């Protein structure tokens, strides 16, 4: 929709609080609009009228616009009422986009969005020193959309995109697509179409960057006029990832990625996408190359949680689906001495890829949370006594504490933890492959709990 040039005096309903909704609320107040908040929970203090979100819609004050928070289901009665009354419904991203005057790179995909958003911003920091990153990652767009900055790098989730009008971004990145959020989108086609809303397909001045698989899908079924670029491991990709030479080749530069810090093919593919986006928006290749080795990743994403005497712990709490976990583990070494910690609230996913991974061999698996109800039987059929089932992460570390510590022959003071006669572990990888909401507010709280348990455990090991 086209926003009025001034929001002053307009009655606008913000449906859903949270980070996004509250940011939109504050922006509307700053623009002298007359916002109304409608949410499940009443805030302790608010300077605007509040209504519970289960109120009969006809009891709400008359408004000219609804701003929907991404967590609100499309079937909410207030949204149906707005549609009947022809009241426009927009997203917080729509609101920010209308008032922002700089260039925008948007990033979406099932996995890797946050890392890629942060990586693109990192690569462009010299070329665009005033840039800001945000959206679904960190800072809501409306909290800085009226600042005089040259570039915004935005992570955009499918929830945000399905609510948005055409965003007319300068560069869009669609990383990958795997089964996720089907409780919301119902089908993979709906999920794909929500993600694809990031693209300005009919605009020849727009650049859409996609994986090889998504490019093939677009070429086979979708009409487009935008500039379509791909990244991947085939030589005809616009950003060709050569795993043998550790180079990424574009039409403008050959990048040395041998000192790129993040492990795994999936992270190198994210880097290839990031390089293309950085080039397309105007980043200088020499500057991009200089910054590649300096990126250290984000917390809770295959982060080293602790190391001592050859024992290592990895915190990958951001892994909230099987696709993410399997991508991280694809190049993991010493798998037969690795304890994989899985669990939480599982999503509607095919478990065959998990079984195919485990059948190749694993040190052991600890399974916790709600996932035990649906995952235990299938995993046990494959790895038998190498599966431990517990209630929570605290119980997980009780298993580790009961293990016996043995020195590794010929390796100075290095040790291994023997959990049973047949299970000896040197690496503990926390990559849950499930949502956190059965026991935690979010994946960050879950990851921080894991980090604290790791610190306590390693403190008890004598040097």
Swiss-Prot record:
Pathway named in the protein's UniProt entry: Cell wall biogenesis; peptidoglycan biosynthesis
A single BP term in Gene Ontology: cell division
Amino-acid positions noted as binding ATP in the UniProt annotation, renumbered to this chain: 109-115
Keyword annotations: ATP-binding, Cell cycle, Cell division, Cell shape, Cell wall biogenesis/degradation, Cytoplasm, Ligase, Nucleotide-binding, Peptidoglycan synthesis
Catalysed conversion reaction: UDP-N-acetyl-alpha-D-muramoyl-L-alanine + D-glutamate + ATP = UDP-N-acetyl-alpha-D-muramoyl-L-alanyl-D-glutamate + ADP + phosphate + H(+)
GO cellular component, one term: cytoplasm
One matching Pfam family: Mur_ligase_M
GO molecular function, one term: UDP-N-acetylmuramoylalanine-D-glutamate ligase activity
Subcellular location: Cytoplasm
Keyword match Isomerase: no
Domain of life: Bacteria
Entry-linked InterPro entries: Mur-like_cat_sf, Mur_ligase_C_dom_sf, Mur_ligase_cen, MurD
Leading EC class: ligase
Principal cellular location given in the protein's record: cytoplasm
EC code: 6.3.2.9
Record-stated family: Belongs to the MurCDEF family.
Xref: PANTHER family: UDP-N-ACETYLMURAMOYLALANINE--D-GLUTAMATE LIGASE
Job description of the protein: Cell wall formation. Catalyzes the addition of glutamate to the nucleotide precursor UDP-N-acetylmuramoyl-L-alanine (UMA).
NCBIfam families on file: murD
Protein name: UDP-N-acetylmuramoylalanine--D-glutamate ligase
Organism: Leptospira interrogans serogroup Icterohaemorrhagiae serovar copenhageni (strain Fiocruz L1-130)
């Amino acid at each position: 929709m086209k926003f009025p040039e001034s929001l002053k005096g307009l009655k606008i309903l913000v449906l859903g609080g949270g980070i996004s909704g509250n940011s939109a609320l504050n922006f509307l107040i700053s623009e002298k609009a007359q916002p109304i908040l409608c949410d499940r929970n009443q805030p302790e203090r608010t300077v605007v009228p509040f209504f519970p979100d289960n109120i009969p819609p006809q009891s709400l004050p008359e408004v000219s616009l609804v701003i929907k928070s991404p967590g609100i289901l499309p079937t909410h009665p207030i949204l149906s009422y707005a549609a009947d009354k022809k009241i426009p419904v927009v997203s917080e991203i729509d609101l920010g986009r209308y008032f922002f005057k700089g260039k925008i790179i948007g990033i979406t995909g099932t996995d890797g969005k946050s890392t890629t958003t942060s990586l693109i911003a990192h690569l462009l920091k010299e070329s665009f020193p005033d840039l800001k990153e945000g959206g679904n990652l960190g800072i809501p767009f409306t909290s800085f959309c009226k600042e005089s900055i040259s570039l915004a790098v935005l992570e955009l989730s499918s929830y945000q995109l399905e609510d948005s009008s055409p965003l007319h971004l300068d560069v869009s990145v669609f990383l990958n697509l795997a089964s996720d959020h089907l409780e919301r989108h119902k089908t993979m086609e709906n999920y794909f179409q929500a993600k694809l809303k990031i693209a300005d397909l009919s605009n020849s001045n727009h650049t859409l960057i996609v994986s090889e698989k998504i490019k093939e899908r677009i070429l086979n079924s979708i009409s487009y006029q935008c500039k379509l670029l791909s990244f991947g491991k085939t030589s005809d990709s616009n950003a060709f990832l050569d795993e043998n030479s550790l180079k990424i080749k574009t039409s403008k530069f050959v990048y040395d990625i041998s000192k790129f810090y993040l492990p795994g093919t999936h992270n190198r593919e994210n880097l290839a996408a990031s390089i293309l986006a950085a080039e397309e928006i105007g980043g200088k290749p020499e500057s991009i190359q200089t910054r590649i080795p300096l990126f250290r990743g984000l917390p809770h994403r295959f982060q080293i949680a602790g190391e001592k005497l050859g024992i290592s712990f990895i915190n990958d709490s951001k892994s909230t689906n099987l696709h993410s976990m399997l991508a991280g583990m694809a190049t993991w070494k010493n798998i037969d001495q690795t304890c994989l910690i899985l669990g939480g609230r599982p999503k509607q996913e095919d478990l065959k890829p998990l079984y195919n991974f485990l059948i190749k061999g694993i040190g052991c698996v600890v399974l916790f949370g709600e996932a035990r109800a649906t995952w235990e039987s299938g995993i046990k059929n494959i790895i038998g006594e190498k599966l431990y089932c517990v209630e929570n992460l605290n119980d997980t570390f009780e298993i580790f504490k009961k293990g016996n510590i043995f020195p590794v022959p010929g390796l100075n003071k290095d040790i291994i933890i023997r959990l049973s006669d047949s299970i000896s572990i040197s690496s503990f990888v926390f990559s849950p492959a499930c949502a956190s909401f059965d026991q935690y507010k979010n994946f960050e709280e879950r990851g921080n709990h894991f980090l604290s348990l790791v610190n306590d455990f390693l403190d008890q090991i004598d040097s």
